Amino acid sequence: MIGNLKPLEIVLIIAVILLLFGAKKLPDMARSLGKSARILKSEAKAMKKDDAATAAPTTETVADDTVPPQSTTARTIQAAPGDVTSSRPVSEAKPTTQS
């Protein structure tokens, strides 16, 4: 369908996009889309790595009913590999005591 577009139609589509979003917002939108794509790609790689790590043991083990203690260190979510400007700490639910 996209291959059937003529050059004039492509120019008209670009003009409509510029009119809708404005020339100032388009670079920011493209940058945001690129960051989102990098995050999605890194998360997909991490999931594949986790799946490979859990699938590697082929021996049967007995399930342990104990719950491991939660870590008290703060975790950080990083938007993209090497992108330290958008790193932020994870806000975890903490019990509140109100009198």
Swiss-Prot record:
GO molecular function: protein transmembrane transporter activity
One GO BP annotation of this record: protein transport by the Tat complex
Cross-referenced InterPro entries: TatA/B/E, TatA/E
Keyword Membrane listed: yes
Keywords: Cell membrane, Membrane, Protein transport, Translocation, Transmembrane, Transmembrane helix, Transport
Main localization (coarse): membrane
Transmembrane region(s): 1-21
Polar residues bias: start-end ranges: 84-99
Subunit structure, as described in the record: The Tat system comprises two distinct complexes: a TatABC complex, containing multiple copies of TatA, TatB and TatC subunits, and a separate TatA complex, containing only TatA subunits. Substrates initially bind to the TatABC complex, which probably triggers association of the separate TatA complex to form the active translocon.
Stated family: Belongs to the TatA/E family.
Name listed for the protein in its UniProt record: Sec-independent protein translocase protein TatA
Source organism (scientific name): Streptomyces griseus subsp. griseus (strain JCM 4626 / CBS 651.72 / NBRC 13350 / KCC S-0626 / ISP 5235)
